Amino acid sequence: MTSVIQKLSQQLGWWRTLIIHRFFPSVALRRNLARDKEDEIELRLLPTLVDPNRIAIDVGANVGSYTAALNPFAAHVIAIEPHPRLAGILRAFPAENVTVKQAVASAPGIRQARLAVSLVNGREADALAQVDHGNSQENVRLYDVPAITLDDCAHKPVGFVKIDVEGHEFDVLDGAARLLTEDRPI
């Protein structure tokens, strides 16, 4: 009996999370931010690291925990998330100073990226998503998404950049030469 109750509780927990993320994204962001502040100590440092007169960029924004954390401290936040479903959650973010873009290119002239999201038991495993370089495996869903370099992303000075893109950080930095030399963000 206990095993059945535990399984049911686990399933309801997953559904509850899904429903909250789908229909109440701002509640999900607040909950994630509260949890992340306990787990990720660097979030507590943001008030001292983020310049309130400059732009902050969250590359690999996922559902927006860092976006929400950056929002009170930056003049404007640009959240970049290539996964269309997660970008949709970010677009529902209830703040006027947040802009959502879908993907970051490694070089000028690249206007589209292909995202490969692995399927596990027929469901997308968001944590396993990565840029497809034409060598994707069978159990993936492909998305073509608009891309922009970090240099083209912001037209005002950028003071802070967070990059979490599952091993493609150097690709992101390749498209940020001007931003890094002129703006010198943290």
Stretches with model-predicted labels:
Residues 1-186:
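Phosphate/nucleotide-binding beta-alpha loop and adjacent structural elements of enzyme active sites
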